[in-house]
């Protein structure tokens, strides 16, 4: 079975396509954009726009449709920031293809952006490093929020299967462990 056939079995193919387009579009534009033009500012703006679209899409549409989770941040009456997490009805059918693609890309993108940050640092490309820090902050925020939102452990099961449990055990002992 080809990748296209598997993805066509999605319960929400439009949400899946936009999820992948924004997430991969930002990465590919950052990595290969300067091959097509020498205008760094244009690439910077385009990547930031793709990252913003990805953040909004994941937070408001893809997470709700693909895995039945949603989160937002609001200010309480005392002015404190309060994170609100919402989970769909546990009886709701979650398509395994949607779920696997969502969780793997949700956790995979920040890892790729961190690798690109290390590369930019080693190459002394400090303007690129600013862009990569924006990407890391947006993708990690979504990843941490959805990890906290996932009451039933769907993400932890998928991450455990993919990494053999190494990532989840390592994350529990670090800063990320507070959010998991």
From Swiss-Prot:
Transmembrane annotation, as ranges: 13-35, 40-58, 101-121, 126-146
One Pfam family, short name: DUF846
Keywords, ordered alphabetically: Golgi apparatus, Membrane, Transmembrane, Transmembrane helix
GO biological process: protein secretion; vesicle-mediated transport
Transmembrane listed as a keyword: yes
Main location: Golgi
Entry membrane topology: Multi-pass membrane protein
Compartments it resides in: Golgi apparatus membrane
GO cellular component, one term: Golgi membrane
Metal-binding as UniProt keyword: no
Family under the similarity heading: Belongs to the TVP23 family.
Role noted for this protein: Golgi membrane protein involved in vesicular trafficking.
Protein name, per record: Golgi apparatus membrane protein TVP23
Species whose genome carries this gene: Yarrowia lipolytica (strain CLIB 122 / E 150) (Yeast)
Native organism taxonomy: Eukaryota, Fungi, Dikarya, Ascomycota, Saccharomycotina
């Amino acid at each position: 079975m080809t990748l296209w056939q598997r993805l066509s079995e999605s319960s929400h193919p439009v949400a899946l396509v936009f999820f992948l387009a924004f997430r991969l579009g930002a990465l590919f534009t950052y990595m290969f954009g300067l091959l097509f033009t020498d205008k760094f500012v244009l690439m910077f703006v385009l990547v930031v726009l793709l990252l913003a679209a990805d953040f909004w899409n994941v937070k408001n549409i893809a997470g709700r449709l693909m895995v039945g989770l949603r989160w937002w941040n609001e200010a309480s009456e005392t002015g404190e920031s309060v994170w609100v997490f919402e989970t769909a009805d546990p009886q709701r059918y979650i398509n395994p293809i949607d779920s696997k693609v969502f969780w793997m890309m949700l956790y995979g993108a920040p890892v790729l952006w961190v690798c690109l940050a290390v590369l930019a640092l080693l190459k002394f490309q400090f303007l690129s490093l600013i862009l990569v820090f924006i990407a890391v902050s947006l993708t990690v925020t979504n990843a941490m929020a959805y990890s906290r939102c996932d009451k039933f452990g769907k993400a932890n099961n998928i991450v455990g299967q993919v990494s053999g449990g190494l990532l989840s055990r390592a994350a529990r002992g670090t800063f990320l462990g507070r959010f998991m």
